[in-house]
């Protein structure tokens, strides 16, 4: 059994690949796949977003190379940003 961090990394990889490739490139998330992933894995984050275009905005921000899809590296940027925000929130309120 790996460390907590190794397990977290494996989970991140598995979550990405569980949602990618249903509509094309198996190494990227389409807009629909990203939306499904966010609804499944980060539903409380989406619930807080009152903006109906939240997924479109997230997709636009993440898609650094402009190909209309989110690759693993671009996805990790989202997870890292959310993790930093959560860290700041939880440590400031503890």
Swiss-Prot record:
Cellular compartments annotated: Cytoplasm; Sarcoplasmic reticulum; Mitochondrion
Tissue specificity statement from the Swiss-Prot or TrEMBL entry: Although predominant among the water-soluble brain proteins, S100 is also found in a variety of other tissues.
Keywords, in A-Z order: Calcium, Cytoplasm, Metal-binding, Mitochondrion, Repeat, S-nitrosylation, Sarcoplasmic reticulum
The UniProt record lists the keyword ATP-binding: no
Post-translational modification as stated in the protein's UniProt record: Glutathionylated; glutathionylation increases affinity to calcium about 10-fold.
Record-listed S-nitrosocysteine modification sites: 86
GO biological process, alphabetically ordered: negative regulation of transcription by RNA polymerase II; positive regulation of sprouting angiogenesis; regulation of heart contraction
Principal location class: cytoplasm
Keyword hit for Metal-binding: yes
Pfam families: EF-hand_1, S_100
Residue intervals of the EF-hand domain: 13-48, 50-85
SS bond list: none
Annotated residues for binding of Ca(2+) 1: 28, 33
Positions that bind Ca(2+) 2: 63, 65, 67, 69, 74
Gene Ontology CC terms: A band; cytoplasm; cytosol; Golgi apparatus; I band; M band; mitochondrion; nucleoplasm
One GO molecular-function entry: protein homodimerization activity
General function of this protein: Small calcium binding protein that plays important roles in several biological processes such as Ca(2+) homeostasis, chondrocyte biology and cardiomyocyte regulation. In response to an increase in intracellular Ca(2+) levels, binds calcium which triggers conformational changes. These changes allow interactions with specific target proteins and modulate their activity.
Summary of subunit composition and partner proteins: Dimer of either two alpha chains, or two beta chains, or one alpha and one beta chain. Also forms heterodimers with S100P. Interacts with AGER. Interacts with CAPZA1. Interacts with FKBP4. Interacts with RYR1 and RYR2. Interacts with CACYBP in a calcium-dependent manner. Interacts with PPP5C (via TPR repeats); the interaction is calcium-dependent and modulates PPP5C activity. Interacts with ATP2A2 and PLN in a Ca(2+)-dependent manner. Interacts with mitochondrial F1-ATPase subunits ATP5F1A and ATP5F1B; these interactions increase F1-ATPase activity.
Further remark: Able to bind zinc in vitro; the binding sites are different from the calcium binding sites. The physiological relevance of zinc binding is unclear. Physiological concentrations of potassium antagonize the binding of both divalent cations, especially affecting the high-affinity calcium-binding sites.
Protein's recorded name: Protein S100-A1
Annotated source species: Rattus norvegicus
